[in-house]
Structure formats: structure tokens, C-alpha cells
């Protein structure tokens, strides 16, 4: 019997060791010529991407977005640098895969079986719905039979493939495809009335509705679609295994959940009238106060300070609430006194005091709070008080969450109204649900303001170019006929060229190319696990979310 027990023990030990070895080999089939071995030996993960709602370049020329941070996390997990090449269209990123110029294609891409002959996909990490959108104020189609106008989609996408399938059911369905416009540009064209319909995913639509509230959803397609990364098809699966391992760890560490909260949670609901009122106020009211927001914003983005003020008072310097808070930043008397503000109804004084108070709160926050999250903790304290903010952090820890992550803490804010929770806390009852909505609203307004100002700047830039071109065309210096009357020669040209409708000068089958400014700085970005840089300039460091594994204790 003892020998039998020993034999069982030996078998168990051998089985465990074999399982460990096999498990590592399945996860990391690291032969000398494997793709993952090449990536690690070269010290570089090559990503080919298209500007999209999931990966983009912000105002500071920094790469941002869900896909960007995820790619950065994967490169950090492998212990290599990240090289991202931004391409102008989807076809080029798949060409990069086929030609061996990229390891992974990233662009908020939906699973598309038409691509599987030459590519394969990694794990899916988001689910979206394809939606047909139209311009608010026009007739809402109830099905594809009701399409009456120009339907435009980006070529090479799952949306184009979907329309090809739908054409079998709707033989009269017509559409156009283009590789010259980004997702955001097509949605902007729809908002401006240049096209009538497009098919897009629910995330892109939700984000752009904050900037162009005229975008309206006609109906959803029934099936959800997975968002995924693409790789070149081959018999060698080492990169697939590494990706699967990384995504499993990302789920365990809640990296995916945190990124979803950071980029998308605040746009889950949409109020057309509220957004329209805000957009109109950007044009009509903001110019009066923008210099003051810029002057006193200190360490935060002035547009975020403006969004806070809109949430507080709708940019009304005389606003007063029943609780006694007053002014554009709705300061209490004690707060105003602490910040040295004598007149809360003076717009400049109010903005100065509000900005100073936010900076004061930020300085008081524990250093353990993640950098990206500090402003949201500060805003919750601005709304309900610093003590209640500390209480909800304590409650979060009591309930097993991370008190230093806004993702965990905001979920517990509504619990401050429940006696079984607030009775255990230092400062007691608080309207935590209001603080939750307060922060989410500010995030939405900030996103709307940033996006709308960028869109307006691009349009003005295009208009300026058109005006310069028109001036050149009709300038007397450019008239070729000697002695011709300038006014006689200018008139016909002026009548033919409409600045508003310059796009109409192009053939309907040839869409104009994207201007360099609108391509969002196409090019190469070489990123180490702890910094972001292009090939000639080094920018500010970008923190990488930590991911750990038994083999990769980074």
C-alpha cells in the first residue's frame, strides 16, 4: 500500500511538471524562427493603425485611445518597444500585414470574415452594434428599403462587407465606398448634410454625437460584432498564444474594464437637447469667458475648467442656487473666503476662485491615487466635499475595491445614500449619486468641447485654403490676357466657384484626398514601454498600466 501511495505521488509530481512545461510551450511556442521570438529579439512590436475612435492623435500630438493603451500594455508585457505607423486607410494596414511590415493591425476593427483568407484575428475585447445613421430633421428610415439618398461607408471595413450581404436581401440597396475619409470625417459629413446615411459602429456614433448631435440612429442591425486585432495568416501561432495570454491577464487585472470606463462609460447615454444647448453656447457664450478659463486653468486643461463651469452654472455669472452657492463656478461663501474671493458674482473672480479650489483639492489628494484619475476624485470632492470623497474611498476598500482607482470608487458613490453604508463612515450621508452624475456630465461636456473646437478649427482651415485659392484664381496678376478688363474676367470665375460647395467640383466617383491636417499627422511613432516618441522628437512620458505574469514580473 505504501509503494502504491509513493507511485501515485510520483505520477502526480510528473503530471504537474509536464503540465507546467506543456502549458508554457502552448502559451509561448518560442522556436528560433517563431514570430514572437523575432519580436522579442528585435525588441520591437510593429503596429499598423488607422486613426479611429479607438486610436488617435490628440491636441498635444500624443497618441491616445483604447487601442493605443492596449497595444502599449502588450508591448510592455513582452518587454519590447512599440512602433506604431498611422496609415491613411484600412487597405494599407492590411497591406502592411501581408508585406511583413507590421505584426498587428489595429484600428477599432470589427471581425470581418472577408479578411480571413490572408489574416487571422486575436481575441475579441469589445462588442459593438452596427447602426444605420441619418441626419436629425430628415425622414428616419425604418429599414434598408427606405434608403433614399447617398449612403457612404469606408471601403475595406466590416460595414462595406455587411452592405454586400444585405444587398442580397435588398436588391435596390445602393451605396458608395471611399478610402479617402476617416470614420469621424464621414460622420461629420453626415452631420453637415453632405451625405444622407452611413453605417457605423455604436462606439464611434456615441462619441461623435457629443460633437455633432445632428447624428441620429435610424436602427440597429441585429447581430453584435466583435472588435479585434488582425495578424497575418500563417501556420505559426506564437503571436496568437502571446496575445491570448496577455488578454487573459488583462481581464484578470481589470485593464480592459478600466480602459472601457476611461474612454466610453461617460457616453453611454445621450441627450440631444442638452448637447445642442451646449454646442450653441460654445459659439455664443464661451468667447466671453474663454480668456479667463485659459488664464486661471493652472495645471488642468482650460477646456475642462470650462466644462466644470458649464455643469455648475451654464456659464451664467449671476447663477444662484437655493443652497446659497453663487456665481459662474457656484462657490460657497466659506470656499470663496478661503480662496480670497470677495465677489462671487464677478465672472473673473469666480473662475479664479473655482480653479484655485480645484488645484487646492488636487494637492490634498493622496499620492497613491493614479495620475489619470486624480481630476475625477477632485471633482467629486468639489461637488460633495472632501470628507465625503474620503469616505467613499474608505467604503470602496471595505467592499474589496481599490480606493485609488476611480473605476472602483465611482461605483460605490450611490451607496452613500444607504444607511447601512453611510452609518459606518466618518461624515455620514451624502448624495453620492449626484456626485457620480456630476463627474460623468463634466466628462461628456469636456469631450464635446474638445471635439467641437477641433472640428470648427478644421473647417475654418479648409475655408481659409479655399478663400486663398479663390483669391489666387481671380487675382488680376494671374490673368493671362494682356490688357483685359479685370472685372470682366473675375466675374465668370467668381460665379463658378462656390466656397461652401467646393466639394461639388470633384467627380462623384472621385472623392477629394484628405488634407494633411485632417489626417491627424500620419507617420511613425516609436514607443518604449515608458515613453512615447516619434522618430525625431521625444515627447512627455506616457505611463504604462502594469501587467504581471509568472514569467513576466514587469
Predicted region positions:
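Short, functionally critical alpha-helical segments immediately adjacent to catalytic or ligand/cofactor-binding
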Residues: 300-316, 351-355, 378-384, 442
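Extended ligand-binding regions for polar small-molecule ligands
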Residues: 8, 23-30, 69-77, 136-160, ...
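Extracytoplasmic small-molecule ligand-binding "clamshell" domains
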Residues: 3-15, 24-109, 113, 117, ...
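Export/targeting segments at the very N-terminus of extracytoplasmic proteins
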Residues: 264-314, 348, 365-366
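Periplasmic-binding protein-like
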Residues: 51, 124-135, 202, 206-245, ...
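Catalytic and substrate-binding regions of cell-wall glycan-acting enzymes that process beta-1,4-linked
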Residues: 377-448
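Substrate-binding/active-site groove segments that recognize
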Residues: 318-342, 347-360, 415-418, 442
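A ligand-binding cleft/hinge motif common to bilobed small-molecule-binding domains
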Residues: 108-117, 164-165, 188-223, 390-391, ...
Amino acid at each position: 500500500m505504501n509503494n502504491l501511495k509513493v507511485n501515485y505521488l510520483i505520477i502526480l509530481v510528473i503530471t504537474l511538471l509536464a503540465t507546467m512545461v506543456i502549458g508554457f510551450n502552448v502559451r509561448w511556442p518560442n522556436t528560433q524562427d517563431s514570430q514572437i521570438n523575432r519580436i522579442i529579439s528585435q525588441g520591437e512590436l510593429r503596429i499598423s493603425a488607422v486613426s479611429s475612435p479607438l486610436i488617435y492623435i490628440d491636441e498635444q500630438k500624443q497618441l491616445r485611445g483604447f487601442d493605443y493603451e492596449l497595444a502599449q500594455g502588450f508591448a510592455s508585457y513582452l518587454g519590447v518597444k512599440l512602433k506604431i505607423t498611422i496609415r491613411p486607410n484600412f487597405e494599407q494596414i492590411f497591406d502592411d500585414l501581408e508585406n511583413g511590415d507590421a505584426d498587428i493591425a489595429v484600428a477599432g476593427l470589427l471581425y470581418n470574415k472577408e479578411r480571413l483568407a490572408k489574416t487571422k484575428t486575436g481575441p475579441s475585447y469589445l462588442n459593438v452594434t452596427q447602426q444605420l445613421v441619418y441626419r436629425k430633421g430628415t425622414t428616419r428610415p425604418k429599414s434598408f428599403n427606405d434608403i433614399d439618398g447617398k449612403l457612404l461607408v469606408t471601403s475595406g471595413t466590416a460595414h462595406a462587407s455587411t452592405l454586400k450581404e444585405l444587398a442580397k436581401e435588398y436588391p435596390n440597396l445602393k451605396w458608395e465606398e471611399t478610402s479617402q475619409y476617416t470614420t469621424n470625417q464621414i460622420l461629420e459629413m453626415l452631420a453637415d448634410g453632405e451625405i444622407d446615411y452611413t453605417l457605423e459602429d455604436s462606439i464611434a456614433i456615441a462619441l461623435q454625437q457629443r460633437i455633432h448631435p445632428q447624428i441620429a440612429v435610424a436602427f440597429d442591425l441585429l447581430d453584435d460584432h466583435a472588435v479585434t486585432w488582425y495578424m497575418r495568416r500563417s501556420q505559426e501561432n506564437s503571436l496568437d498564444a502571446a496575445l491570448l495570454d496577455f488578454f487573459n491577464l488583462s481581464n484578470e487585472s481589470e485593464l480592459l474594464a478600466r480602459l472601457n470606463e476611461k474612454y466610453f462609460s461617460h457616453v453611454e447615454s445621450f441627450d440631444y437637447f442638452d448637447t445642442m444647448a451646449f454646442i450653441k453656447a460654445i459659439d455664443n457664450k464661451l468667447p466671453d469667458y474663454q480668456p479667463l478659463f485659459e488664464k486661471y486653468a493652472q495645471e488642468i486643461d482650460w477646456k475642462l475648467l470650462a466644462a466644470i463651469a458649464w455643469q455648475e452654472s451654464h456659464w451664467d455669472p449671476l447663477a444662484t442656487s437655493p443652497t446659497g452657492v453663487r456665481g459662474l463656478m457656484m462657490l460657497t461663501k466659506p470656499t470663496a473666503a478661503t480662496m480670497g474671493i470677495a465677489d462671487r458674482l464677478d465672472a473673473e473672480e469666480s473662475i479664479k476662485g473655482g480653479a484655485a479650489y480645484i488645484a487646492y483639492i488636487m494637492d490634498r489628494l493622496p499620492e497613491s491615487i493614479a495620475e489619470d484619475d486624480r481630476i475625477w476624485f477632485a471633482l467629486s470632492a468639489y461637488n460633495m466635499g472632501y470628507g465625503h470623497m474620503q469616505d467613499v474611498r474608505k467604503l470602496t476598500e471595505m467592499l474589496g475595491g481599490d480606493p485609488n482607482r476611480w473605476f472602483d470608487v465611482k461605483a460605490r458613490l450611490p451607496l452613500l445614500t444607504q444607511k447601512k453604508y453611510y452609518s459606518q463612515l466618518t461624515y455620514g450621508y451624502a448624495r453620492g449619486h449626484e456626485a457620480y452624475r456630476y463627474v460623468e456630465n463634466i466628462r461628456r461636456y469636456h469631450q464635446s468641447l474638445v471635439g467641437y473646437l477641433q472640428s470648427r478649427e478644421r473647417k475654418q482651415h479648409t475655408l481659409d485654403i479655399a478663400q486663398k485659392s479663390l483669391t489666387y484664381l481671380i487675382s488680376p496678376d494671374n490673368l493671362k490676357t494682356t490688357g483685359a478688363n479685370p472685372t470682366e474676367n473675375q466675374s465668370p470665375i467668381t460665379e463658378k466657384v462656390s466656397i461652401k460647395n467646393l466639394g461639388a467640383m470633384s467627380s462623384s466617383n472621385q472623392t477629394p484626398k484628405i488634407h494633411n491636417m485632417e489626417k491627424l499627422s500620419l507617420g511613425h511613432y516609436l514607443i518604449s514601454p515608458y515613453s512615447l516618441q516619434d522618430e525625431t522628437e521625444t515627447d512627455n512620458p506616457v505611463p504604462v498600466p502594469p501587467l504581471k505574469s509568472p514569467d513576466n514580473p514587469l
